[in-house]
């Protein structure tokens, strides 16, 4: 059911009480269960009664009343832990929130706390809030953030980030935090508009997540005074301690571009950390193929392998998370009153579940998945196929700018002096400089420049997958870039790679040109084929999907290609403005 004002109605609560009193039968009984008591940090034995989607009893008794509808499961050979929580999900990395939630639940991650940015920008408020309510009808629990900024420079930022819109998002019961705050430099230097929204968030007793890579003690201190309560950008044990000492809830990340959780945990232990109750685990919204090896189960296993006590390894993905968000009254522990999210394990040191309950429903039973073929009605919420109703000609592709952008790793861009003759239609493959063009998705403006460090042999690439949904063209051959653009138009958005006038790899993104409508497993295969083709043509960094997403993202150094033009992040100025077509 959708969480509106109350999760359970008065009638439902009365029925739950009747089960405890023996007047009604539970729907599911887990007898002889060894479970993690998260509050005590102990493994205890009990019988667990569930009525529909709620745990109603945990103790030594069996129900006084059972009927033909009651399922009784002997759990004597297993251990049970709470369903895992991913508190920092970006559910739009080619996949969509529905497909990701279904896939995650099958691996034991039954609660997602999601970034709202893409839907905040792409949908009008009423449709977006109706969409998140409909998504909460899944077996998974789906919660959301409220962004304060677009993490880029937009032509119509004020039209998106309105007081009334932010206020309604913040007040929604499925929205449990503000952030992540990527425009923190603006707040420190005087942006009272964002500070007002932060104050509103704290007034509503909701936490605020920051985005503070490499931040000093003074910066972290100031952000704490401004109301920020957590951060996920610690990259060393020392940076974790700096945040903990300043009172932050601190996320420990293991993602496609920062896969160093084991190193961070080792450094924390070497520095004397033995209390992990103010830490949480996150995969930070990685692309599809990263999740082949698991989601929160994978991170818990890394923690266990590094000698973290089981109560903490599981706690950082369950109880500690729920407690921080003020959701421990219904999530994160196995106790009466909580939603029936439960993972069944063969043993304590293998967090990959053999069976999973989500809201009291079996989504996995003895390794068999159930209910993963459901379809979500995206078009009902205005999320339709991308339509590009304008054309692009070879004559428009002129690259005379003296300064280009250099991709130094998956996500960092630096300025560089263009060293090749860019007036030609085709560039040589003995260097890594390519043509680069950002195009308004409505065809109104363009930003032509050069990119170094992306690849040596990419002939033509087109992508509508970007922070703002605007269109990226990259390549050595202008004619193949045009072919890629036209193929992108025809397939309704996504990513297209062209060589010698032919499409050699593509990822269709049928939902607004940003998200795939396919199951996670299919998107994984499409992504792997695309990445393989790109690597064969000289892409050498960790994650090309993040590269495409972050070309416009001003929360990262040093320069970005935004709707307003090429933007200097440090100086907060437009170096070269966009050109009207």
Swiss-Prot record:
Disulfide bonds: none annotated. Its EC number is 3.5.4.2. It is an enzyme of class 3 (hydrolase). It comes from the Bacteria. One of its GO terms (biological process) is adenine catabolic process. Transmembrane segments: none annotated. Keywords: Hydrolase. GO terms for molecular function: adenine deaminase activity. It catalyses: adenine + H2O + H(+) = hypoxanthine + NH4(+). Pfam families: Adenine_deam_C, Amidohydro_1. Belongs to the metallo-dependent hydrolases superfamily. Adenine deaminase family. This is Putative adenine deaminase BH0637.
